[in-house]
């Protein structure tokens, strides 16, 4: 182990537990001392203020995170987050996935796609009392009242089409917050390196370390000439954000405090052990089996047809990522006995509960009954749900549901089918063409139907509609007939169905429309049963969470909500880790590692211009002499250090930190202690995958693209001089 890191390692071991938490911004003042311990000097009150720097420069993509980095609406995120935008503009004659893309001027920036959005969170308001006031004890009525109260709040919040508001549940329904976001509807592609840079190492390196991935890309936000959000138009102008991030060209060193801000998707840290067992024993293995079959199928078909390979590139990347995460979760459950750890903590909670007789002693028992029912319902519906996986059937189901919902007043409609939702509804129908191929869709659907036929939970409506009980039925021929007779493969026809009434649907001869009509009552009955169960859980889960929070506080453990796709902040330090016996992983990787991994074949096929820049040592002022702390600093007055920090003499490519992240944090800006951009979050280590269920500070590490690699790529490899000029570059 490097002597230069001894001090850092000692420091880490002392306060590692402090790094846990995906905190709501308003909570930051309560952990100000923790931030200070990490060397994060930006005032905690500033991080709680969504209207000022740096928080108002952090934006959501709906599935990833990004940030403004110029006064002209330039946005930086991960390459894999911009993947569908790159794919949308990729054709066989100009394959931007393979070749990369750089717009040398704003007039050359193409649309990222009809349903790409940027969301800027402007306000987060506690509306718990408004959502939960005077709720019925009847489960279905209770569920509907929560929904209706939420819809009323959303309607009052969305003062015009420029804003998107949502009510989100926190702590499993114990709290509710109204999220108000400015929505940018014209997003354009600006710059993306080739996939052989942005995804260097591919699925082999995914969730692994050391990494050498240039997982970055640039988009731009556009608005109408009046400065307000507008749909795509050629004469739209760049959006001028209220703030944009300072970019620190000197980056960070080992031991430096860092924090990330972003939109983490889902974690399950407060869930019961029985839920973890269900995921481990049935859900994850079942999902992994299906993903693997789909990946193998699309990969084989893509090798025969370049159009398929391009259209399904985004889906393949997403499925491969999910597949590796599932396998990592399953391996991690066995390697670290997380089930045992969770059960032990649950047992301790029950013991504490007995010492607090004023609290409901049956909290877990009551919740377990409902969870068992929920798992049974999920299992029984799983194969029927997948049996409707055809893209065209999914569209038909949604379109018929829209016609049904339009029979109600807008306030009574389900979320997703209100007037506020129709623009995005239309965009999704348009976007189908960019990631759809009849042969692939039909093959995947046939696989799901065969899996459905092989299990006992059969649905009469589906069996009758497709004649599945008839042993003489040739499933392949049956599906060929459906696809050959439908008009839903045509975008104009799909969009026209948005204006059709229920009678038009019910008298249609289109086979997918007819199938959607036939399945509607069954789908609605299942949805109603799920709502009733959700209504029951909306009482049991908050009661459980209230007691758990009290228990956590009694133990002086961090209390923060599970991730739910809303804006959060996590902090930590730049740090390596002991991945297994005698194997310590250093916090930084170098350009040399790209060359060492290069084979010329995917996924280690670095572009020649990148290899040339490395071999010719065209580093410029991006060369970093050392990524370790100066031994003359205070830390080395306490510990024995080398006379000089160990030499690095390269450009840092990726680095590790102990920040707490999960899916959705991809693209999150990584800040130094001053609140300046020093990298982008893009992955986690394989050992850390199980952090969605249980946070282990010893091995939990996030993987980031170093800003110095991004700037070097822009400067010395791709010559994105026009973009470099836009950035507000600072140095230490």
Curated annotation (Swiss-Prot):
Species in which this protein is naturally found: Shewanella putrefaciens (strain CN-32 / ATCC BAA-453)
Keywords recorded for this protein, A-Z: Aminopeptidase, Hydrolase, Protease, Serine protease, Signal
Function: Catalyzes the removal of dipeptides from the N-terminus of oligopeptides. Shows a strict specificity for acidic residues (Asp or Glu) in the P1 position, and has probably a hydrophobic residue preference at the P2 position. Preferentially cleaves the synthetic substrate Leu-Glu-methylcoumaryl-7-amide (Leu-Glu-MCA) as compared to Leu-Asp-MCA.
Active-site residues, Swiss-Prot/TrEMBL: 80 (charge relay system), 215 (charge relay system), 666 (charge relay system)
Family: Belongs to the peptidase S46 family.
Gene name in the database record: dpp11
Lineage: Bacteria, Pseudomonadati, Pseudomonadota, Gammaproteobacteria, Alteromonadales
Name of the top EC class for this enzyme: hydrolase
EC number: 3.4.14.-
Protein name: Asp/Glu-specific dipeptidyl-peptidase
PROSITE patterns: V8_SER (PS00673)
Signal peptide: 1-18
Keyword Kinase found: no
């Amino acid at each position: 182990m490097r002597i230069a890191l001894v001090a850092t390692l000692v420091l880490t071991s002392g306060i590692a537990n402090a790094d846990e938490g995906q905190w709501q911004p308003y909570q930051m003042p309560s952990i100000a001392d923790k931030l200070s311990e990490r060397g994060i000097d930006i005032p905690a009150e500033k991080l709680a203020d969504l209207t000022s720097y740096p928080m108002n420069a952090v934006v959501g993509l709906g599935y990833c995170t990004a940030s403004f980095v110029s006064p002209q609406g330039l946005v930086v995120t991960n390459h894999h987050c911009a993947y569908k935008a790159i794919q949308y503009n990729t054709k066989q004659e100009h394959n931007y996935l393979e070749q990369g893309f750089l717009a040398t001027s704003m007039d050359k920036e193409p649309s990222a796609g009809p349903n790409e959005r940027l969301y800027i969170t402007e306000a987060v308001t506690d509306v718990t009392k408004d959502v939960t006031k005077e709720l019925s004890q009847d489960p279905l009525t209770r569920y509907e009242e929560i929904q209706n109260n939420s819809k009323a709040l959303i309607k009052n919040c969305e003062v015009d089409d420029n804003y998107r508001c949502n009510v989100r549940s926190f702590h499993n329904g114990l709290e509710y917050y109204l999220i108000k976001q400015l929505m940018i509807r014209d997003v354009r592609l600006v710059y993306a390196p080739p996939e052989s840079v942005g995804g260097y190492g591919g699925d082999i390196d995914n969730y692994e370390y050391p990494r050498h991935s240039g997982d970055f890309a640039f988009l731009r936000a556009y608005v109408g000439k009046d400065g307000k959000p507008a749909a795509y138009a050629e004469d739209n102008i760049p959006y001028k954000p209220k703030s944009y991030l300072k970019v620190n060209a000197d980056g960070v060193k080992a031991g430096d405090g860092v924090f990330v801000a972003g939109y983490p998707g889902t974690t399950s840290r407060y869930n019961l052990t029985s839920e973890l067992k269900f995921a481990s024993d049935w859900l994850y293995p079942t999902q992994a089996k299906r993903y693997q079959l789909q990946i193998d199928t699309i990969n084989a078909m893509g090798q025969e047809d370049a159009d398929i390979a391009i259209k399904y590139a985004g889906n393949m990347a997403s499925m491969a990522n999910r597949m590796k995460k599932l396998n990592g979760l399953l391996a991690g459950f066995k390697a670290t006995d997380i089930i045992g750890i969770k059960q032990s903590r649950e047992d301790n909670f029950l013991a504490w509960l007995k010492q607090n007789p004023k609290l409901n002693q049956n909290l877990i028992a009551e919740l377990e009954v409902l969870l068992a029912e929920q798992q049974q319902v999920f299992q029984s519906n799983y194969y029927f749900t997948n049996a409707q996986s055809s893209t065209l059937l999914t569209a038909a189901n949604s379109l018929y549901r829209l016609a049904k919902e339009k029979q109600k007043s807008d306030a009574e409609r389900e979320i997703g089918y209100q007037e506020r939702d129709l623009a995005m509804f239309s965009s999704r129908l348009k976007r189908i063409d960019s990631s759809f191929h009849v042969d692939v869709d039909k093959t995947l659907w046939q696989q799901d139907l065969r899996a459905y036929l092989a299990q006992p939970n059969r649905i009469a409506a589906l069996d009758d509609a497709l004649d599945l009980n008839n042993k003489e039925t040739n499933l392949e021929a049956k599906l060929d007939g459906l696809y050959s007779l439908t008009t839903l493969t045509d975008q104009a026809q799909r969009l026209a169905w948005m204006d059709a009434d229920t009678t038009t649907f019910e008298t249609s001869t289109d086979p997918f429309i007819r199938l959607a009509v036939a399945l509607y009552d069954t789908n609605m009955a299942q949805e109603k049963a799920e709502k009733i169960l959700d209504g029951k859980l909306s009482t049991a889960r908050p009661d459980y969470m209230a007691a758990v929070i009290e228990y956590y506080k009694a133990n002086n453990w961090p209390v923060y909500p599970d991730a739910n796709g809303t804006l959060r902040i996590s902090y930590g330090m730049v740090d390596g880790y002991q991945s297994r016996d005698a194997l310590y992983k250093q916090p930084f990787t170098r350009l040399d590692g790209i060359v060492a991994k290069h084979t010329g074949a995917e996924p280690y096929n670095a572009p020649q211009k990148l290899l040339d820049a490395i071999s010719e040592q065209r580093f410029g002022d991006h060369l970093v002499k050392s990524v370790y702390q100066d031994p003359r600093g205070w830390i080395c007055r306490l510990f024995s250090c080398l006379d000089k920090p160990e030499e690095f003499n390269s450009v840092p490519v990726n680095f590790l930190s102990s920040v707490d992240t999960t899916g959705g944090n991809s693209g999150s800006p990584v800040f130094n202690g001053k609140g300046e951009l020093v990298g982008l979050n893009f992955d986690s280590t394989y050992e850390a995958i199980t952090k969605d269920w249980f946070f282990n500070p010893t091995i939990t590490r996030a993987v980031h693209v170093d800003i110095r690699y991004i700037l070097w790529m822009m400067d010395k490899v791709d010559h994105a001089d026009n973009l470099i000029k836009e950035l507000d570059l600072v140095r230490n």
